[in-house]
Amino acid sequence: LSSAKASSYLTVLRLPQAARTFGAALVARFAYGIVFLALVLTVDRATGSYAVAGGVLAVFGLASSLLAPYRARLIDRHGVHRALLPMAAACAVLLALIAAVGWQSGASKAVLWVLGAAAGACAPPLGPFMRTLWRELVPDDEQLLQRAYSLDTVAEDLLYVVGPLLTGALTALAEPALAVLLSAMLLLGGTAVLATSPVAASFRGSAAPPPDTGGERAPTPPGRDPRWWVALLEPVLVTAGLGACMGAFNLLAVAFADRHGAAATVSWVSAALAVSSALGGLFYGAIRWRLSTRTRLPILTTFLGVFCVLSGQVTGMVGLGALAGAVGFLMAPTLTTAYLIAGEVDSESRGTEAGTWVNTAFNTGNAAGSAGIGLLLTPLPLAWCFAVTGAFVLLPAAVVALFRTARKNRVSTPGEIPQIAATLNPEGERP
C-alpha cells in the first residue's frame, strides 16, 4: 500500500450527479433492508404460521436471488426505462398487494406464496446497477473508484442494519404490513428518481444485439464467451465461499452463546460484525493499494478464514466478539474487491450482470452455509464447526491463488491474444 494521500469520500459525493444518483439508489435499496423481516412478520400475523412465513420468505428470496443475473442482463440490454423501472414498478405493486392481503388475519396462504414468488422474480438488482453507474460517474481514476465502491458497500451494509430496526418499530406502533407497504413505496419512489438522473437515463444498454454485419459473423457477446465466465470465476467463487462462511458464522455465534449460557449477549457479536465491517470498508477504500485487485482477493479471504478458525479456540463471549470484529473488518473489503473485479471483467457491455453474479453467489452461499453448518452442529464439536466455516473461504482462496499462478505461468503465443483479452485482463486492470 502507498502513503500517497487518497481522495476523500466527500470527493466521491461531489462528483457531478454522484450524490443525487447514489442517494436515489440508496432510497430504493433501503426497501430490501426492510422487506425481509417485514414479510416474515406480516405473513406470520396474517396466517398464524411461522412455517408459511418462512416459506413465503424463501420463495421471495430464491426468486430474487436466482433470477437476478437474468434481470440484470435485461437492464444491460434494454436500459433503465425499458427494464429497470418496469421491474421496480411490478415489484412494488406486488409488495403492496402482499401488504393488503396480509393486513388482516385469515389471509390465503396460497395467494401469499404466489405473490411472494412473483415479487421476488421482479425485484430489480439495484446494487449491481449502481456499481455499474459508479464507473460512469467516476473519471478514469482507479483510487476514486475504489473509494466509491467501498462507500457503496458500507452504505448497503448499514441499510440492512437500520431496516430491521425500522420494521420492528413500525410493527410495535402499527402493523407489520405497513413496513411491507413502506418498502414498496421506497422501491418505486427511489427507482423513479434514479431513472431521472442524467447518468442513469443515459445508460442505453450496451449489451443490445449488434447491428446487421452484412453476412459477416458477428463477434461473440461477452456474456456468451467462455472467457467471460472464466474471468468472472474468481470473484464469484470467493464470494460464494464468503457467503457460506458468514451464514455459518452467524449461526455458530448463536450456538456458542447458548452453550456458554450467554444467549442474550449474541447481539453484541452481531453488532461487532456490522460495525467492524463498516470500519473495515471505509479503511480499505482510503488506502492506495499497490497490489492488483485479483492479488488482494485471496489475501483478504485467507486472513478472514484464519480468524474464523481461531474463533473456535476462544473460551468466552469477549474473545468471540473480538474475533467477530476481525472477521467483520475484512468482510466489506473482500466484497468491495470482488465487486471491483466483476466491474473490470466487462464494464462496457454486461457490467450489471457481472456484478449481479457476485451478489447471487454470496446469497446462495449464505443460505447453503447456514443449512450446512446446522447439520454439523450436533455431531461435531464447536471448534470443528468453526474450522469448517473457515474452510468455506480458505478453500476458494487457495483455488484462486493456484488459478492465478497457472495463468501467470502460461505462455501466450504472440498474435494469438483475442480482442476480448483487453477486457478480460488477468490483472484486473484497465488497458
Regions inferred by a protein language model and the residue ranges of each:
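Cytoplasmic helix-loop-helix junction between adjacent transmembrane helices
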Residues: 117-157
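Intracellular juxtamembrane helix-capping segments at the cytosolic ends
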Residues: 39, 124-139, 253, 333-346
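A late C-terminal transmembrane helix in Major Facilitator Superfamily
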Residues: 349-380
